[in-house]
C-alpha cells in the first residue's frame, strides 16, 4: 500500500477521538478585472528576494531533496486568479502532461455533483445502483461510494505480497472493465456506511454508474465531459482515460499539464462558477468542504480535508492527492490553488511540510 494511505490508516485510530479543527472560509468570486483562465492563465509572477524562499525552492528542485521529497517535477501557484509562481524540473515543462493517479478521484467527485445537479442521479442517498447488486449491496448509496464507505471487501494494496484487488483491477483480468471487476467483490461489512476503507475500486464503480445514467439520457460519457467541463473551463491539455468498456478510469487516470490541473482546482475555489456559467452548484462545493460522516473527518466527495498527516497546511485547505506526491491544494484563506506534481515514493508527508513552508511566504487574503 502506498505510504500516504498507510499513514492515513494508522492515523484513523487516533482520529476517532482527535482531529485538527477544519476551518470553513468563504471563497471569493473571480476578479472580473482579470480574464478567466479558459484560454490563458493571467500571470502576475512575484519577485521574491527573500533568501529563505530562494533557499527552499532551490532545495525543492535539487538532487539533495531526492531522499526526503523525491523528485519535484512541477510547482504551480495560483493566487487571486493569476499565476504567481511556476517552476518545472527539466525535461518537464508547462506543456508536459503528467498522470494524476488518485487525484482523478476528485474529478469523479465533480462529475457526480454535475449528475445530481441535472437530476441524472437522484441524490447522494440513492441506492439500488446496479442491476447485479441483488444482495445487501443494493443498500450501498452514492454517498457510500463517494466517501469510501461501501463495505465492499476490496483490498487496496500496491505490492504483490498477498491479495491486491487494485493491481488485479488495473493490470490483471479486471483491466478491460475495471468497474465491473470492483462491483463483483462481496460485502465485508453487512451494513454499508459504517467504516472508511480507501478504495480505488469504489471510485470506478461510481464512474460506471455515471456512464449508465448518461446512457439512459442517450449521452456519451466522453462527450458529456468535453461539452460540460473540458470545453467550458479550458482543459485543452487534459486526457481522461477510458477502459475497454467505455468507463472513465476515475480512480487513477487523468493526464494533464500543471496549468490544467490548476483549472480544476480553480473551479472549486470559485464555488463551481466559471465565466458566468455554473459548472457545478455551489451547494455541491459547500458539501465537499464538510467532512462526511464516518470518514474520521478527513474526507468528503473524493476530496481530502485536513488531518494529522497534513496538519502543517492552512486549516481551511481541501485537496486532491495522488500516488507519487501529486497534489492540488485549494486554500480559500489565501485565495490560492497549488499544484505539485512529482515522483515521491516514500512517506509524502514531507512533501506536505515542504509545500506548507513555500505557501507561508504568500500573504493571506
Regions found by a protein language model. Give the residues of each.
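Bacterial N-terminal signal peptides
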Residues: 8-17
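N-terminal leader/targeting segments and the immediately adjacent pre-domain N-terminus
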Residues: 16-93, 117-121, 147, 179, ...
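Structured C-terminal helix/loop/strand segments within mature extracytoplasmic catalytic/sensor domains
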Residues: 23, 320-365
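Active-site SXXK
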Residues: 81, 98-123, 145, 206-210, ...
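Active-site helix/loop module of the DD-peptidase/beta-lactamase fold
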Residues: 99, 117-157, 184-187, 215-252
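Active-site-proximal alpha-helical segments within enzyme catalytic domains
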Residues: 202-210, 252-273, 326-342
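Active-site-proximal binding-pocket segments
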Residues: 224-289
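Active-site Gly/Thr loop motif
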Residues: 235-238, 242, 289-337
Amino acid at each position: 500500500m502506498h505510504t500516504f494511505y498507510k499513514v492515513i490508516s494508522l492515523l484513523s485510530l487516533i482520529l476517532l477521538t482527535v482531529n485538527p479543527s477544519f476551518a470553513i472560509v468563504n471563497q471569493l468570486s473571480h476578479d472580473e478585472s482579470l480574464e478567466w483562465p479558459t484560454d490563458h492563465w493571467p500571470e502576475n509572477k512575484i519577485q521574491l528576494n527573500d533568501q529563505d524562499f530562494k533557499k527552499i525552492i532551490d532545495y525543492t528542485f535539487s538532487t539533495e531533496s531526492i531522499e526526503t521529497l523525491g523528485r519535484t517535477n512541477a510547482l504551480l501557484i495560483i493566487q487571486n486568479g493569476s499565476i504567481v509562481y511556476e517552476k518545472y524540473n527539466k525535461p518537464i515543462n508547462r506543456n508536459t502532461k503528467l498522470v494524476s493517479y488518485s487525484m482523478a478521484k476528485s474529478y469523479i467527485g465533480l462529475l457526480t455533483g454535475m449528475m445530481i445537479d441535472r437530476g441524472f442521479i437522484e441524490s447522494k442517498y440513492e441506492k439500488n445502483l446496479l442491476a447485479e447488486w441483488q444482495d445487501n449491496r443494493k443498500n450501498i448509496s452514492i454517498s457510500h461510494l463517494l466517501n469510501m464507505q461501501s463495505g465492499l471487501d476490496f483490498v487496496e494494496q500496491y505490492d504483490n505480497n498477498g491479495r491486491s484487488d487494485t493491481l488485479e483491477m488495473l493490470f490483471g483480468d479486471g483491466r478491460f472493465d475495471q468497474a465491473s471487476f470492483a462491483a463483483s467483490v462481496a460485502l465485508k461489512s453487512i451494513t454499508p456506511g459504517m467504516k472508511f476503507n480507501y478504495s480505488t475500486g469504489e471510485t470506478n464503480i461510481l464512474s460506471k454508474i455515471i456512464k449508465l445514467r448518461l446512457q439512459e439520457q442517450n449521452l456519451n460519457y466522453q462527450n458529456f465531459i468535453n461539452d460540460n467541463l473540458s470545453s467550458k473551463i479550458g482543459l485543452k491539455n487534459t486526457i481522461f482515460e477510458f477502459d475497454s468498456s467505455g468507463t472513465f478510469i476515475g480512480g487513477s487516470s487523468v493526464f494533464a499539464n500543471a496549468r490544467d490541473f490548476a483549472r480544476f482546482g480553480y473551479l472549486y475555489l470559485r464555488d463551481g462558477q466559471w465565466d458566468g456559467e455554473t459548472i457545478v452548484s455551489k451547494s455541491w462545493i459547500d458539501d465537499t468542504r464538510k467532512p462526511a460522516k464516518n470518514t474520521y473527518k478527513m474526507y468528503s466527495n473524493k476530496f481530502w480535508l485536513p488531518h494529522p498527516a497534513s496538519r502543517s497546511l492552512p486549516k481551511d485547505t481541501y485537496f486532491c492527492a495522488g500516488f507519487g506526491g501529486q497534489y492540488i491544494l485549494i486554500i480559500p484563506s489565501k485565495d490560492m490553488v497549488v499544484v505539485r506534481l512529482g515522483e515521491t515514493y516514500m512517506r509524502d508527508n514531507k512533501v506536505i511540510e515542504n509545500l506548507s513552508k513555500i505557501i507561508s511566504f504568500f500573504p493571506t487574503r
